[in-house]
Amino acid sequence: MEEFQRYLELDRSRQHDFLYPLLFREYIYALAHDHGLNKSILSENAGYGNKSSSIIVKRLITRMYQQNPLIFSANDSIQNQFFGHNKNLYSQIISEGFAVIVEIPFSLRLVSFLERKEIAKSQNLQSIHSIFPFLEDKFSHLDYVSXVLIPYHIHLEILVQTLRYWVKDASSLHLLRFFLHEYWNTLITPKKYITLFSKGNPRLFLFLYNSHICEYESIFLFLRNKSSHLRSTSSGIFFERIYFYVKIKHFVKVFFDNDFQCILWFFKDPFMHYVKYQGKSILASKXTPLLMNKWKYYLVNLWQYHFYAWFQPGRININQLCXYSLDFLGYRSSVRLNSSVVXXQMLKNLFLINNAMKXFETIVPIIPLIGSLSKANFCNTLGHPISKPTRSDSSDSDIINRFLRICRNLSHYHSGSSKKKSLYRVKYILRLSCVKTLARKHKITIRTFLKKSGSEFLEKFLTEEEVVLSLIFPRTYSTSRRLYXZQSWYLDITSINDLVNYE
């Protein structure tokens, strides 16, 4: 690990030239093991200790360059037992090593960027909930919104060409290109495109996808800055690109035969907000739908002519924000008009003034969440709680703690909901499912189990916030109504709950 850190501190001119030899360094695969693999796949095979993993990688790369990588000599009986039956396994070994190596230039640029801009490292910026305060602040003033599915069926050569701007090591790029064409179907099958963000996908391909999105967003932000009256503020990292302006100028001239700056000035846009999440993006704008249509065809032409990805304009729908709901990150968000009546009196005349204000509202979509609970065997498809099968040696405390952990995690994640009715229903399903599971284990009725457990069992399912507030405030109608509409966004949530990740 220390050797890896020393390598990161080398001069930038040397960093690009010596990535290929890192494939044969032991600590690279130890680092990949710590971040990616669940087990030490190299040490589990007989005859291979930790010190021989670099030898294994050398043989893997040699066989990969051969016409048939699974043809071995008669003296390689032990190796044949390892390689011949584990093609997926050793392709994963190399992919994990590749992932660590190609991330080095990105990590170095990120560190230098943060140091140059004097940006303090903050874990709060990584929270999923940090996006919702931004939406509350901005979206209530906008008029039109469009949800766009970012295409990711990109040709392998496009992915390699994207990395050429970051990795200057020709040997590494050549080996990466050969590896992708050889083992693409082995590592990612067509069915896995649907669950691209699942935990089981190889780290290398998640990195390639993120670099592909970085390429797309760098061009998109460039066009956004050039076509806006205001300077845009972004939380992303914007790096210099080779011949970047020349590429953009050529890209625009494909559609327009005029001066580049004049074209962009014609499309000046006062308000345009962009949000990306889970392979999707949201575009929101103020004023007329003409601006949204302009950016719609900008994106379509960008994907088709720059990334050679077929993108249908009809799949991008432009909707009025006041009559449209956004489903993302486990929430259903919308902008609603809240009317309030204000009584004003002037001399002897009394006036009633009706004020309508836009408010950003977030609720928990109950139907998809019940579908996730049904798949996890907490309830049926109608939302009726059922007993969950458990191991015979599981204790009551283990079962209760498991249900409590799930319930509190969901409450913590959905704490920003403006209406808690759906969340209360989910808590009811989990609480009654826990009761039925324990009653089934002891072979008694639910009524008998609740009599034996008492009220202490139900109080365990209260979250810490509910317990504190119930002690501070009396149980009145106004207090319960206040708790029902209370919103809290936590900045320590860095991953989506498995039950929420139904998209």
Swiss-Prot record:
GO terms for cellular component: chloroplast. GO terms for biological process: mRNA processing; RNA splicing; tRNA processing. InterPro entries: Domain_X (IPR024937), Maturase_MatK (IPR002866), Maturase_MatK_N (IPR024942). It is found in: Plastid, Chloroplast. Keywords: Chloroplast, mRNA processing, Plastid, RNA-binding, tRNA processing. Its main location: plastid. Transmembrane segments: none annotated. GO terms for molecular function: RNA binding. Usually encoded in the trnK tRNA gene intron. Probably assists in splicing its own and other chloroplast group II introns. Belongs to the intron maturase 2 family. MatK subfamily. This is Maturase K. It comes from Backhousia subargentea. The lineage of its organism: Eukaryota, Viridiplantae, Streptophyta, Embryophyta, Tracheophyta.
